[in-house]
Amino acid sequence: MAKRGGFPGGNMPGNMNNLMKQAQRMQKQMEDKTKEMEEKQWEATAGGGAVTVTVSGKKEVVSVKLSKEVVDPDDIEMLEDLIVAATNEALRKMEEESASAMNSIAGGLGNFGGLGGLF
C-alpha cells in the first residue's frame, strides 16, 4: 500500500531542512549582493563625451558633468537630450549588471516554481 503525505523518494524532514538552509543562504547572498550593488556607481556619456552622467545602484543620479562646448544658450533642447541619453545609458548599465548579479545567485533555483527567472 502506498504511503500518503510526504514527498516521493523519502525523507521529507531532511529534504525540507536542506531546502530551508539553501533558501536562507540564497537570501543572505542576495542581501549582500544588493548592498554591494547599491554602493557601486555607473557612468555613461553622450555627445562624444560632452555630457557625462553617473548613477548609483540606488537608481539615483550622482553627478552630471557638461563640457563647455555643449552649453549653447540657443540650443538648450540638444543639451537636455544629451543629458537624458547619458542618464538612460548609465541606468541601463546598472540594471544590466544588477540583473546579471542576481541571476547568478537565483540560477541555483533551477527555475524552481518559475522563481529562477524573476531577476
UniProtKB/Swiss-Prot annotation:
Cleavable signal peptide: none
CC terms in the record's Gene Ontology section: bacterial nucleoid; cytosol
Superkingdom of the source species: Bacteria
TM spans (from-to): none
Keyword list, A-Z: Cytoplasm, DNA-binding
GO molecular function list: DNA binding
Protein name from the UniProt record: Nucleoid-associated protein Cphy_0047
Source organism of the structure: Lachnoclostridium phytofermentans (strain ATCC 700394 / DSM 18823 / ISDg)
Similarity comment: Belongs to the YbaB/EbfC family.
